[in-house]
């Protein structure tokens, strides 16, 4: 056992030494890769994801599930094998995109609203791109077609739902319709908003760190001696944004890349997965299956609507903040509503006193 540990330590030291040498020798492309990663974070990831992460945190703390109609609760349970507390989590995950669903599910698990098995199920299937990334960043910017971006969003969303139904059918026998009671904090709305922003900022910074690391690593592959097909495969498997850029002229592959998510996204949710004991192979298998389903749905839609295809080649692609204003506007609107409501509650409380 000691010899095995010694071998691992030696191998780790050698690997770190090689990486260090590569960083020195190829410092210019690595710097450019990190710079590209920062651009992706500032102009693509954070504007589309951060508002939904904040809203998700506020929703699980402030929105009660008590008034969910019984028929919706039953339909949701028999579809996904999940309690009514998970309805808002799944909706937020589908709208916010990865990794918002995993982030919110992890928070609900920590609060005791979801069991480990329920949170695990959500994290495995609620992992897709939101409409902002699919339609605007991928469709409009990369493929020059919002309609194709809509097709990408539809295929990835349907893939998530189908995957969730399959996982629900597998684990439904061990679940019950009765859900744990929601545990709401007694803090004011302004305090809830502050806490939500703080937690979302921390999660966003971790995700951006992973994006910069993978962007730097992929920059090393941009070598003239490496075949373009190898670069495309590496990008598709590793990082979703770069993978979409490389495959923007192949809608079916593009749909698969979106549903796969990339190893970078898988690393981003690793912390959440560890909380509910999700194995790496489970993520790989489920996401690979989701990618196949998404590609098949895209293939069907393109055969029904053959005119909806990207004819433009990607040339000198640069990340542009197409929808950053939407996210900022949403945050400001929610902020104003919360503080107005909180002000009314405070005034009413003071009058009663």
Segments the model singles out, each with a brief description of its role:
Residues 64, 193, 197-262:
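Transmembrane helical segments that form the transport core of multi-pass membrane transport proteins
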């Amino acid at each position: 056992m000691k010899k095995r540990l010694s071998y691992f330590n030696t191998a780790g030291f050698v690997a770190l030494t090689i990486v260090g040498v590569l960083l020195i020798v190829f410092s210019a492309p690595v710097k450019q890769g990190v710079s590209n990663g920062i651009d992706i974070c500032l102009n693509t990831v954070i504007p589309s994801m951060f508002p939904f992460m904040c809203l998700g945190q506020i929703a699980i703390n402030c929105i009660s599930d008590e008034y969910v109609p019984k028929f919706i609760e039953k339909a949701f349970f028999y579809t996904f094998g999940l309690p009514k507390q998970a309805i808002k989590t799944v909706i937020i995950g589908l709208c916010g995109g990865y990794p918002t669903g995993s982030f919110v599910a992890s928070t609900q698990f920590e609060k005791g609203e979801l069991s480990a098995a329920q949170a695990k199920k959500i994290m495995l299937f609620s992992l897709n791109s939101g409409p902002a990334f699919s339609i605007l960043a991928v469709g409009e910017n990369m493929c020059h077609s919002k309609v194709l971006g809509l097709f990408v969003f539809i295929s990835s969303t349907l893939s998530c739902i189908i995957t969730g139904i399959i996982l629900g059918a597998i684990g439904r026998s061990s679940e019950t319709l009765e859900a744990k009671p929601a545990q709401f904090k007694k803090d004011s709305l302004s305090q809830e908003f502050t806490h939500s922003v703080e937690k979302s900022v921390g999660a966003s910074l971790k995700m951006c760190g992973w994006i910069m690391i993978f962007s730097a690593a992929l920059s090393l592959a941009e070598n003239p001696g490496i075949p373009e097909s190898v670069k495309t495969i590496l990008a598709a498997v590793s990082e979703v944004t770069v993978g979409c850029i490389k495959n923007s002229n192949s809608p079916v592959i593009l749909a698969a890349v979106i549903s796969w998510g990339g190893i970078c996204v898988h690393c981003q949710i690793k912390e959440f997965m560890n909380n509910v004991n999700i194995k790496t192979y489970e993520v790989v298998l489920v996401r690979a299956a989701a990618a196949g389903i998404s590609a098949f749905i895209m293939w069907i839609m393109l055969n029904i609507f053959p005119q909806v295809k990207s004819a433009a080649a990607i040339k000198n692609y640069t990340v542009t903040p197409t929808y950053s204003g939407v996210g900022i506007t949403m945050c400001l609107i929610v902020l104003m509503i919360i503080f107005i409501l909180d002000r009314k509650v405070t005034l009413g409380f003071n009058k009663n006193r």
